[in-house]
Amino acid sequence: MNVLITGTSSGIGKGCAKYFLKNGHKVYGFDRKESTIEHPDYKHYCLDIRDKEMYPELPPMQIVINNAGVQNEDDIDINLKGTIAVTEHYAVQPEIRSVIMIGSASGHTGSEFPEYAASKGGVLSYTKNVAMIIAPYQATCNSL
């Protein structure tokens, strides 16, 4: 399968990429930082997910994992708007099988960082929207 993962230079995104590579999948990674993964089936794109003009032409994805996120003044633009842009560009198509949004408990409960909580709450709501949009393709969308 073709798998697109945002935020692959470290943490959850890097772990997800390694998992899919270990299991024989082709992985495409987006991150503002340089690649930290060396594998023949991994292709890294150094880009900011807010900049749709930078999105590369890729083969149809079967899995999209929206992991890129920040906790700073760019919360809404990256965590929510960037997730929407990547999803609409790569996931809403007939070959998609699964879209996964990396959320946060703050999206459910709020936090001392209101913009971050709002961005993750928006991701939760958007997850439900995407689930309805891609259901005709027999695909699922969930937030973790």
Predicted regions span which residues?
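Conserved Rossmann-fold SDR core element
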Residues: 134-144
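Conserved glycine-rich Rossmann-like NAD(P)H-binding loop of the short-chain dehydrogenase/reductase
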Residues: 23-37
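Catalytic loop of short-chain dehydrogenase/reductase
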Residues: 98-122, 127-136
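N-terminal Rossmann NAD(P)H-binding glycine-rich loop of SDR-like oxidoreductase domains
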Residues: 9, 17
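A short, exposed helix-loop element centered on a Lys and neighboring polar residues
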Residues: 87-88, 128
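Rossmann-fold cofactor-recognition segment
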Residues: 40-51
